[in-house]
């Protein structure tokens, strides 16, 4: 008869039984898998459906655990546990999502002037265009009536943009717009602080970001942050001025962060260095300029320049070492502390608590939270007195983080962190007491300090720190003491060398294992990253960051941190300037990614050489993958989702070009850097031509970033000779009559005429119009062409015949100035793409223009509702929308009337 041993019985020793460790692994894996499946939902179920999943799964798990000893067959029992736990993960995550989604902004409140009262709950972000902040809403009124808003909203208080009642008047791009959108300087934003209560008039909209293949999911990021509406403060002269109602200390950490950031910028004159220090101390990544981010990414050290999981983990490790050292030294005064709690345990728990405080001061962002939960799980398991194998420690930490933050599974940082930790677990030495966050489990008597109480020899004493000082001072003679000092010195040097060797090997292992994953997630990897990190990791973590943090207590230390950062910055800039500093590959499918990660892991593991060599062929799919291209004689047009502006990629069998590059959002951000560069990298494109239709900022804003990424591309445009882009790359004029052929596809410029350059008028009138045809299907890209130019094209018999197209880029985003009836009658497209921003201030495309398209049975695709739009000459009867292809429930569904 089996003898009961807690949860484990002798019967469990049979290979056909469900052993507790295997059962736990099945439960954890199932839970994570269930969460992952739920995150693939395009739409949420009813809330009661998720409740049913939870109740059913919990009931089944209860029965399984109660009757676990009767499950004699291993795999059926494990599969059942996996399935039930997956159902639990699916149901719990769906329930949380449905509860959260119920508080979303009512679409009827979008674009309305709402009077809100609330409290600033996070450190405001100040920029060149104003200030951005988060407001916890306590009350809201619309036209005197109470309305319900999401608990937390993100607002911008901008200078230089506002509204006022006025007569309809022209705007700079030649369009006319409703009077409520006339431009006017707003009241300058006031200095906001966390904890302050404000009353203000705001205009809100649902969270809406750009939706592009392989692009950043802004809506998911806001979902994770708990933001369910974005908008701006109405602060023009015709609006009631925002009113500060008072201050409170309900957010002291955020107020302290803001004060420290202001002190850093007041002390450090170099704004770039000040931004880096602010990022390291208070987690303000927005303080780092884009040019610096480009250098950090090119050298593979971007993870160091913000408070990331690495910083928090290193901080916990260092803090645990210091606390353990102090704990041991306390025995010189009294052994009470060491007898009450071993030094290793004190260091582990103390390091965790201090790391949590560091993460809190860094803003308690979602990545920081994940790191703390992971560290907490590891510490609890390592200090539990049981010898957990590393896969179980890793898996339990993974499950805890996923349970607390399910949407972390969709974030690149999550996978990089856990793969790195898993690789270090798998390739490192066995866990032991040298691990400051863990340590070997101590015998029960040792944990009580029994050996020390019995006066045992130091070698057999527990790692409490109590025995070491007493035995040290009780050793007899002076000569022996000197010899011991020499031995300690030699041992110390040997330990330093050993630690450096271990650190170098771990960096190499991480680089090797994460390279395939980085290529999958970012389509780019730094070839100089190993060298850069070998210098930057110890320098930033052991020199720059401690000095920057100590500067909070004594400001002159920020001067030393500045010098240390400047030296590192110069070295990184030199490495980034190397032509071979980075390598980019096209985005590979999931099977390639899995193979690549396995290949990297095999190469990094402590295995015989012939086993590790198997990792090389597994890496090849990631490195050599090329996306499918149009066949010879075919072409495709991809309209990127870039907001208010134009940006399209045209591809043939072996060539490609970009037509316009979208808007410039701010001094540090534009559509080229945000959208086009990542998209071109993911597609594996080296473009032949960049054509800029005309000089308006919503068409050329991203050009510098695209040109920097594509040094081989020719620049063709209608910009004037003195334009600043001419200094970046000399532009060729686009002229009617120009033509070329790629892979059986003909390209022809229809506008402007040479005479237009002699007497240029409005920039829109100079738009380059490009016709693309394979003899069967045709696309027409019309820029911001206006009525006069449209009619001129229609009036030319030769040109009119060539206007007929299957696909049309709507001229001027659907403005009243364009899309005349005769022009549409000549083009006769099946599809027309209107690239415009969601709820843009020009109301593009305007309803009267859309009516003209409807009258002619032309399907208008609007980018806010479609995202990136792809049209292919091989399938001319349909347009593929990114928002439909990759739909997830947290993404914004655009109401047609609101576009």
Where would I find each of the regions flagged by the language model?
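Membrane-embedded alpha-helical segments of integral membrane proteins
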Residues: 19-66, 411-414, 557-605
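Residue-level signal for inorganic ion chemistry
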Residues: 34, 118, 413, 514, ...
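Internal/C-terminal transmembrane anchor helices
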Residues: 72-96, 608-631
